[in-house]
UniProtKB/Swiss-Prot annotation:
Pathway: Carbohydrate biosynthesis; gluconeogenesis
Any coiled-coil regions, as ranges: none
Protein name: Glucose-6-phosphatase 2
Chemical reaction(s) catalysed: D-glucose 6-phosphate + H2O = D-glucose + phosphate
Gene source species: Homo sapiens (Human)
Catalytic residue positions: H115, H174
Domain of life according to the entry: Eukaryota
Pfam families per the UniProt record, alphabetical: PAP2
Amino acid sequence: MDFLHRNGVLIIQHLQKDYRAYYTFLNFMSNVGDPRNIFFIYFPLCFQFNQTVGTKMIWVAVIGDWLNLIFKWILFGHRPYWWVQETQIYPNHSSPCLEQFPTTCETGPGSPSGHAMGASCVWYVMVTAALSHTVCGMDKFSITLHRLTWSFLWSVFWLIQISVCISRVFIATHFPHQVILGVIGGMLVAEAFEHTPGIQTASLGTYLKTNLFLFLFAVGFYLLLRVLNIDLLWSVPIAKKWCANPDWIHIDTTPFAGLVRNLGVLFGLGFAINSEMFLLSCRGGNNYTLSFRLLCALTSLTILQLYHFLQIPTHEEHLFYVLSFCKSASIPLTVVAFIPYSVHMLMKQSGKKSQ
């Protein structure tokens, strides 16, 4: 691993030296790959226009991030910004100098990259969904158009993945091999769900059982390794030790914070899809109109941006996890049930008044 790490540091130094002027763009691309944006941006847009794609996106994102956590616990991957300080391979304490940024100091293990895995997951789902839509009703005349669309969409996919990967390497939070593993892992998870149609008809019980399994497996795995005297939170004190600015350390980057966030979202989706509000909005005649979907999408994006103003207290870790679960569960409840139902009732009332 020292070979990969040492050469990875050289790549990071090259990027930071020669591409420093592109920091704003690279920081933006890092945010594009942020797993949290799946729930705040990609999901509300996709679900309001195509419920099948939106539902699949949540399952892919949650299972993908859960697998990412398990692999991080198994692989014990270092992050560049602390590895250069901890390693003994550099003689006479001549550790390379890596610049740190406000988004550098993530506290969990580094391999595979969660941002790269999350970005490849959701964009794979969106690209394959768009391509399957273009195939429907295709005749000989449109075969050329389909091929052009295929080439364009996959080019966009890889452009985004490469940009996200470079951005994560640039800020010294990942080594190159870690982002490559993330992209491959995300695509494999997304492809697996292309052959899992059962999630579209999953009952509330299925959602609850899945949630319980993911939680118990993760906690059980953590406790088992603790019994074996293996600390899975080993990276947190190292991150705090070598982060250039203590204010850049955030509790929501710890391994369990991501687990709680994902379980909350899946829990909320299960309740929302099986709720009376969602079923009533689906039965409405407006559900399939473009105006209804646009209004739901815009309202969802607007309301979810307000969630960023809901600051969860971080002084008590257990309280933070509970509130984070509740906040995450409310996202699909808002997008899937509350907003479509409210828009449906408003359009229904306005329709009665116009008659």
